[in-house]
């Protein structure tokens, strides 16, 4: 049974749209936990477009589930993580011109640098996950870098036409099995919604799904706690969808 990590970046996006103090993502994280979130995820970007350093510091003090800090693999970010001590760091690619993370980290081309940074974080007691596309070469590179976790990028699955989604789901299923055979633990996220999450949640060996935008969008109508409850029910009790066959 997969657990649910709630990404609260989009709450901070609303705040930063007016450069004001509300809505504050820190108390919103508590509401997400009250709704059943198994963890809270935030992405501290280099350009600080949504989550701020202050948010991360306060969340470390207040989150009672797990705090997952997404960040670029830069020296400045490593130093912040070592100071804050989140429960997990997820290393992600980052480009200033992107609206949101557009794809997985190219671990294969950065093995030496990533291995060093992963070692420093894990030696400090912070498990590291790498956000990657569901590809054998990237998973092998993650293993070689001695990461403990991978987070599979589900964006291609989420954005695929319904006729193509079964093959994308198969890629995620195969990548999950391969990663586990390599000794890696597996999370997934990006673009998942109330409409497409169940087949991914049902993948054998999938440990956690990190979901943000769709929950915050639903919260506008029903409130954050209820939005989280609804997603948690789908993640924990995924139904069999005839479109995807038996999974």
Swiss-Prot record:
Localization annotation: Cytoplasm
Site, Transition state stabilizer: residue positions: 151
Enzyme active site: 43 (proton acceptor), 70 (proton acceptor), 190 (proton donor)
Protein residues bound to 1-deoxy-D-xylulose 5-phosphate: 9-10, 45, 50, 100
Keywords carried by this UniProt record: Cytoplasm, Pyridoxine biosynthesis, Transferase
Disulfide partners: none
Pfam families: PdxJ
Pathway: Cofactor biosynthesis; pyridoxine 5'-phosphate biosynthesis; pyridoxine 5'-phosphate from D-erythrose 4-phosphate: step 5/5
A molecular function GO annotation: pyridoxine 5'-phosphate synthase activity
Enzyme Commission number(s) from the entry: 2.6.99.2
Residues that coordinate or bind 3-amino-2-oxopropyl phosphate: 7, 18, 191, 212-213
Transmembrane regions listed in the UniProt entry: none
InterPro entries (alphabetical): Aldolase_TIM, PyrdxlP_synth_PdxJ, Pyridoxine-5'_phos_synth
GO biological process: pyridoxine biosynthetic process
Record's catalysed reaction(s): 3-amino-2-oxopropyl phosphate + 1-deoxy-D-xylulose 5-phosphate = pyridoxine 5'-phosphate + phosphate + 2 H2O + H(+)
Cytoplasm in keyword set: yes
Any single Gene Ontology cellular-component annotation: cytosol
Family: Belongs to the PNP synthase family.
Function summary: Catalyzes the complicated ring closure reaction between the two acyclic compounds 1-deoxy-D-xylulose-5-phosphate (DXP) and 3-amino-2-oxopropyl phosphate (1-amino-acetone-3-phosphate or AAP) to form pyridoxine 5'-phosphate (PNP) and inorganic phosphate.
The protein's assembly and partners: Homooctamer; tetramer of dimers.
Protein name (record): Pyridoxine 5'-phosphate synthase
UniProt organism field: Synechococcus sp. (strain WH7803)
Gene (name only): pdxJ
């Amino acid at each position: 049974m997969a657990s649910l990590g709630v990404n609260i970046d989009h709450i901070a996006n609303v705040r930063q749209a007016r450069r004001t103090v509300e809505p504050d993502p820190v108390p919103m994280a508590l509401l997400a936990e009250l709704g059943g979130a198994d963890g809270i995820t935030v992405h501290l970007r280099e350009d600080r477009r949504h989550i701020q350093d202050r948010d991360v510091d306060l969340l470390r003090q207040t989150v009672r589930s797990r705090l997952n800090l997404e960040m670029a693999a830069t020296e400045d970010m490593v130093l912040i993580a070592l100071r804050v001590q989140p429960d997990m760091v997820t290393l992600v690619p980052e480009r200033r011109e992107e609206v949101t993370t557009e794809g997985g980290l190219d671990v294969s081309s950065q093995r030496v640098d990533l291995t060093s940074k992963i070692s420093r974080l894990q030696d400090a007691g912070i498990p590291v996950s790498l956000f990657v596309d569901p590809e054998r070469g990237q998973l092998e590179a993650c293993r070689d870098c001695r990461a403990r976790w991978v987070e599979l990028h589900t964006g291609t699955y989420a954005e695929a036409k319904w006729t193509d989604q079964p093959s994308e789901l198969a890629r995620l299923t195969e990548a999950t099995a391969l990663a586990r055979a390599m000794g890696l633990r597996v999370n997934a996220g990006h673009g998942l919604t109330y409409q497409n999450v169940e087949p991914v949640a049902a993948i054998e060996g999938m440990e956690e799904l990190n979901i943000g935008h769709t929950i915050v969008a639903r919260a506008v109508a029903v409130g954050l706690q209820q939005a989280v409850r609804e997603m948690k029910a789908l993640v924990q009790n995924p139904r069999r969808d005839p479109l995807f066959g038996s999974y």
